Amino acid sequence: MPSLTAFFGGTFDPIHYGHLQPVTALAKLVGLTQVVLMPNNVPPHRQQPEASSRQRFHMAELAVEGNPLFTVDDRELQRQTPSYTIDTLEALRAEKGHDAPLGFIIGQDSLLTLHHWHRWQDLLGVCHLLVCARPGYRSTLETPELQQWLDDHLTHAPEDLHQQPHGRIFLADTPLVTISATDIRQRRQQGLDCHDLLPPVVLRYINEHGLYQ
């Protein structure tokens, strides 16, 4: 069976250690050898990122340059209109074939609101969900029915993620990193130091392009 590939989407405005450190820890926990970062195309009716699509993509590339675990995929940024997560995952599944194990990485905060996503009940028919812990969020879902859905698909065995192409949920005990892109943008606007929040090469790019001022 092909090796497990995991996809991790985000605005990455900018990418920072709060993205990279938990996902790196997750990769070690479950034996991932490939994580694909996918910067999001933000819908026009939502607040737009402060950095352009290309700048967000380039910062993601810089952040993982030389790290064999990560690659960056710009397919979402190439779209003329934003798409639902399930659409992207179904396209990836079609590319990879029926038998390839696919994972989609989300934070604990997203798991708690997953039932509001478009066609959320179809997600596990396409991929596994790999969930990174997030500070300050509860560990149970909103209703008994949702909790039962989680319990029915939950696995504590990483090998399940490699031996099955989709259908499992893995709750990873990853480091709780209290860094957010909002905090970084605010610190930049206040002239505060950010060197411990994101890779030096990304901070250098931000400085050179005058971002988040």
Swiss-Prot record:
Would you tell me the protein name for this molecule? Probable nicotinate-nucleotide adenylyltransferase
Q: What is its EC number?
A: 2.7.7.18
Name the gene for this chain.
nadD
- What is the enzyme's main class? transferase
Instruction: Identify the species of origin.
Output: Pectobacterium atrosepticum (strain SCRI 1043 / ATCC BAA-672)
Q: Which Gene3D superfamilies match?
A: HUPs
GO BP field: NAD biosynthetic process
Q: Which UniProt keywords apply?
A: ATP-binding, NAD, Nucleotide-binding, Nucleotidyltransferase, Pyridine nucleotide biosynthesis, Transferase
List the SUPFAM superfamilies hit by this protein, alphabetically. Answer: Nucleotidylyl transferase
Cleavable signal peptide: none
Listed as disulfide-bonded, the cysteine pairs are: none
Q: What does this protein do?
A: Catalyzes the reversible adenylation of nicotinate mononucleotide (NaMN) to nicotinic acid adenine dinucleotide (NaAD).
A GO molecular-function term, please? ATP binding
Question: Which family, according to the similarity comment?
Answer: Belongs to the NadD family.
